[in-house]
């Protein structure tokens, strides 16, 4: 008893709430939660995060609000989460860009996504679509390839950033298809798509979820999708394989996953995982995701961590083999 009183007294003198972490974790969440997206509004990750935040809020019993923290191809948003308090009130919805950036050894500072975050849960996947402006005189990949080599005006490709998913997957596609185009990096997929619609750039590579409503309203053209099978959302658009395009053995889909700061308490992580799994099973969300060609694909922290480690290795090997630079 004397020892316990001494500990309590010492804690009070130092201003340390005794067992505060356990108390915070036990009633988590008791206020709203920030879900950081490292890119601007309108891109694939932002779109999924906003659709998903409603069912996740319902499952957690607290509001989950999306906050866009764009810059440096996602890095500013990721760093915001990495340096936040590990209490579960600042999370991030990340995508493949998180595992691509470490492969660019010329970019500083370097970071390791497998050790600097708490992997909470893998959530979903979505194929990408090769889209061109209506002003581009090409209606299939064969015509696009020919145009890229014959046009007096160089084609321009708009990416979500130098080290973004769209840029790297485009590098894989370009390598396999031998397409000649100038890269134009943007601060997110939303601005890139806006300029494609306006005809300021010729090509971009959004997720099929972003492409579908624009294709349906004939504001853009889609020439191919990156999945191994045709997209249910874009059934008339061929796959790269059907278009005769071979590519390196890397996964050419967007994936979406939830991470927290390093050191997130296990009880908080478990509550989040349970809520994420429940949210992904909500019938209305499943129908909404299906209409956008997003496939729920829940996996808990250990599996997500293994995926991060594997993807960092595979993308790093591709980047090194092709001599790609991030700056």
Name these PLM-found stretches.
Residues 83-89, 102-191, 240-245, 255-288:
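Hinge/capping helix and adjacent helix->loop/strand transition within the periplasmic-binding protein
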Residues 1-30, 326-327:
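Short, low-complexity disordered leader/linker segments with a strong preference
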Residues 22-115, 154, 162, 178-207, ...:
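N-terminal (or domain-start) structured segment
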Residues 250-251:
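HAMP domain helices
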Residues 47, 51, 55, 59, ...:
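Extracytoplasmic/secreted proteins, especially bacterial periplasmic and envelope-associated proteins
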Residues 97-106, 172-176, 203-237, 316:
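A ligand-binding cleft/hinge motif common to bilobed small-molecule-binding domains
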Residues 30-32, 175-179, 242, 266-327:
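An extracytoplasmic/periplasmic, membrane-proximal ligand-sensing/linker region
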């Amino acid at each position: 008893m004397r020892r316990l009183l001494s500990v309590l007294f010492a804690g009070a003198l130092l201003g340390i709430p005794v067992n505060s972490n356990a108390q915070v974790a036990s009633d988590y969440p008791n206020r709203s939660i920030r879900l950081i997206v490292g890119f601007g509004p309108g891109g694939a990750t932002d779109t999924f995060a906003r659709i998903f935040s409603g069912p996740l809020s319902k499952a957690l019993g607290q509001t989950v609000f999306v906050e866009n923290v764009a810059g440096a191809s996602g890095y500013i948003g990721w760093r915001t989460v990495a340096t936040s308090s590990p209490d579960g009130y600042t999370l991030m919805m990340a995508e493949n860009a998180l595992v691509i950036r470490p492969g660019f050894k010329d970019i500083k500072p370097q970071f390791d996504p497998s050790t600097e975050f708490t992997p909470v849960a893998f959530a979903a996947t979505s194929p990408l679509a090769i889209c061109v402006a209506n002003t581009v005189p090409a209606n299939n990949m064969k015509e696009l390839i020919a145009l890229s080599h014959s046009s007096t005006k160089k084609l321009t490709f708009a990416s979500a950033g130098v080290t973004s998913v769209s840029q790297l997957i485009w590098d894989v596609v370009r390598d396999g298809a031998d397409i000649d185009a100038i890269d134009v990096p943007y601060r997110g997929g939303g601005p890139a798509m806006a300029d494609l619609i306006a005809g300021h750039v010729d090509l971009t590579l959004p997720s099929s979820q972003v492409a579908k409503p624009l294709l349906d309203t004939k504001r853009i053209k889609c020439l191919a999708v990156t999945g191994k099978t045709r997209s249910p959302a874009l059934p008339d658009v061929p796959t790269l394989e059907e278009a005769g395009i071979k590519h390196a053995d890397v996964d050419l889909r967007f994936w979406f996953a939830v991470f927290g700061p390093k050191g997130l308490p296990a009880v908080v992580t478990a509550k989040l995982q349970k809520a994420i799994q429940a949210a992904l099973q909500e019938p209305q969300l499943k129908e909404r995701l299906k209409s956008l060609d997003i496939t729920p694909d829940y996996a808990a922290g250990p599996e997500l961590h293994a995926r991060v480690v594997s993807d960092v290795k595979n993308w790093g090997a591709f980047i090194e083999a092709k001599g790609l630079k991030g700056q």
